[in-house]
Amino acid sequence: MTAPSLNDIYVARERIAPHVPPTPLMRHPLLDAESGLSIWVKHENHNPTCAFKVRGGLNLVASLTPAERARGIVTASTGNHGQSIGLASRLHGVACTVFVPDGNNPDKNAAMRA
């Protein structure tokens, strides 16, 4: 695997832009006051899956060829990655199966099914 080029990053941004709004970056005055610093928080919890991993799944599924999409996607996850792949698969009409470990958090399992 090679490192992505700057162009690869721009292409990925275009693929995911229709599905993920810009993530809010906010100041929190109480954190500033308590720390004596200027604290900025990037609120990934405002994304469709409430996690930054949504971008990777959307980019991956959007980049599949028609033949790859027809075969579907299989992945393994305990939560965030599975949610990302599930959402992206649903948006692009691709069949998806996510394997989870025995005893996985039921709330995470439900979120991946949603």
Predicted feature residues:
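PLP-dependent amino-acid enzyme catalytic core
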Residues: 1-114
